[in-house]
């Protein structure tokens, strides 16, 4: 039965005209041959991993540890690392990563999801709906 469930994305991909299909260690990767209206954006479809669901544990220790982990912010590179290719000036010097406490606090909240009823979330939903409608129209 798991094999049949894992083939469902492939059958949907065939009906949508997917040009490339590949599977990497239980991950199904589908790439569309169609481009969006913008030349800078190319649509890719990546399905979630095909694996059995793990049982969830409802313990106070786990939830408090997750809250602490969510509040602690760490950068992805070590301090002092030269960030190659991030220089925005021609002939300039590549920036160097700093300690986490040297960055402004608002930087760590840039990638957080907006509140469901906020103006930002509604704007994002509206733009996503427009992009989806434009993608489905014939060109």
Swiss-Prot record:
Alphabetically list the UniProt keywords: Mitochondrion, Ribonucleoprotein, Ribosomal protein, Transit peptide
The record ties this protein, via Pfam families, to: Ribosomal_L37
Skewed-composition ranges (Low complexity): 35-50
Asked if the keyword Transcription regulation belongs to this entry, the reply reads: no
Q: Where is the transit peptide?
A: 1-50
The record's region (Disordered) falls at 35-74
GO function term, MF aspect, one: structural constituent of ribosome
Locations listed in the record? Mitochondrion
One GO cellular component term, please give it: mitochondrial large ribosomal subunit
Skewed-composition ranges (Polar residues): 58-74
InterPro entries per UniProt: Ribosomal_mL54
A GO BP entry is: mitochondrial translation
Functionally, this protein is described as follows: Component of the mitochondrial ribosome (mitoribosome), a dedicated translation machinery responsible for the synthesis of mitochondrial genome-encoded proteins, including at least some of the essential transmembrane subunits of the mitochondrial respiratory chain. The mitoribosomes are attached to the mitochondrial inner membrane and translation products are cotranslationally integrated into the membrane. mL54 may have a meiosis-specific role as it accumulates during the middle stage of sporulation.
The family classification in the record reads: Belongs to the mitochondrion-specific ribosomal protein mL54 family.
The record's subunit annotation is: Component of the mitochondrial large ribosomal subunit (mt-LSU). Mature yeast 74S mitochondrial ribosomes consist of a small (37S) and a large (54S) subunit. The 37S small subunit contains a 15S ribosomal RNA (15S mt-rRNA) and at least 32 different proteins. The 54S large subunit contains a 21S rRNA (21S mt-rRNA) and at least 45 different proteins.
Q: What protein name does the entry list?
A: Large ribosomal subunit protein mL54
Q: What is the species of this protein?
A: Schizosaccharomyces pombe (strain 972 / ATCC 24843) (Fission yeast)
Q: What is the lineage of its organism?
A: Eukaryota, Fungi, Dikarya, Ascomycota, Taphrinomycotina
Question: What's the name of its gene?
Answer: mrpl37
């Amino acid at each position: 039965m798991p094999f049949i469930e894992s083939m469902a994305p492939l059958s949907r991909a065939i009906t949508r005209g997917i040009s490339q299909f590949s599977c990497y260690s239980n991950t199904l990767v589908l790439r569309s041959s169609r481009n969006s209206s913008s030349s800078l954006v190319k649509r890719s479809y990546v399905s979630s991993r095909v694996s059995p669901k793990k049982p969830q544990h409802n313990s106070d220790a786990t939830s408090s540890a997750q809250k602490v982990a969510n509040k602690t912010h760490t950068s992805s590179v070590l301090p002092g690392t030269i960030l190659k290719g991030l220089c925005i000036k021609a002939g300039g010097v590549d920036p160097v990563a700093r300690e986490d406490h040297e960055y402004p606090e608002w930087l760590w909240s840039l990638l957080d999801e907006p509140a469901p009823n906020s103006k930002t979330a509604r704007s994002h939903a509206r733009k996503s709906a427009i992009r989806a409608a434009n993608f489905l129209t014939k060109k």
